[in-house]
Amino acid sequence: MQGAERGRMQMPDDRLEREAGGLVAGVDEVGRGPLAGPVVAAAVLLPASGFPAHLAGLIDDSKKLDAAARDRAFAALLAEPGITIGIGAASVTEIGRLNILHASMLAMRRAVERLPTIPDLALVDGNRAPALPCAARCVVGGDAKCLSIAAASIIAKVVRDRAMARLARRYPVYGWERNAGYPTPAHRAGLTEFGPTPHHRTAFGLVRQLLAMRMEAVV
């Protein structure tokens, strides 16, 4: 999305972070909907002085940014000395055992716990927060409202997309380097033709449905 177009849309700001005071982290997860791969979460801990103003123009809800813009924002966030980042994930095995909601909560908790300093407050995207070692506040649509949550959404998205691209080199028939495990026609066709990998979420209804179609075709 071009800068002028983004400028006409609502952009996230750091109002909630400034109102909270103290050390504030934004928390978000990526990967609830895919048929394969982990769910990944990030926690972005801001310096006490707040969100660095020179980065604000790069940051938006990761879903609104193209891959190149996400990569630029990702690199800038990692290079910013005042910002610290924690990454958490829940595996396909954990997703199958816990269900995707609870696995997402686990990934977010792990992300916060892996910060070098536990914040005073975590701003968590959505309407439900995991049990955390700090106070938590849910912000519905937070990745479009809060800079810290938007930053976390970018970190989680880039980390997960790159992990799926690496897996795609081992399992090239599903198009994961392009679809990141989401149920695109190419991914669904690959699953129906070639069956699942150890990275597929076989507890998901759509995966079971596609595998049943594969079995019917074989019979």
Swiss-Prot record:
Co-factor requirement: Mn(2+); Mg(2+)
A Gene Ontology BP annotation from the UniProt entry: mismatch repair
Manner of cofactor binding, per the entry note: Manganese or magnesium. Binds 1 divalent metal ion per monomer in the absence of substrate. May bind a second metal ion after substrate binding.
EC number: 3.1.26.4
Keyword Translocase: no
A single Gene Ontology CC term: ribonuclease H2 complex
Main localization of the protein described in the UniProt heading: cytoplasm
Binding positions for a divalent metal cation per the UniProt entry: D28, E29, D125
Catalytic reaction list: Endonucleolytic cleavage to 5'-phosphomonoester
Entry's Gene Ontology molecular function annotations: manganese ion binding; RNA binding; RNA-DNA hybrid ribonuclease activity
The keyword Cytoplasm is annotated on this UniProt entry: yes
Gene3D superfamilies, sorted: Ribonuclease H-like superfamily/Ribonuclease H (3.30.420.10)
Bilayer-spanning residue ranges: none
Keywords tagged on the record: Cytoplasm, Endonuclease, Hydrolase, Manganese, Metal-binding, Nuclease
InterPro entries: RNase_HII, RNase_HII/HIII, RNase_HII/HIII_dom, RNaseH-like_sf, RNaseH_sf
Segments forming domain RNase H type-2: 22-219
Compartments, as annotated in UniProt: Cytoplasm
Family to which the UniProt record says this protein belongs: Belongs to the RNase HII family.
Known function: Endonuclease that specifically degrades the RNA of RNA-DNA hybrids.
UniProt protein name: Ribonuclease HII
Top-level taxonomy: Bacteria, Pseudomonadati, Pseudomonadota, Alphaproteobacteria, Acetobacterales
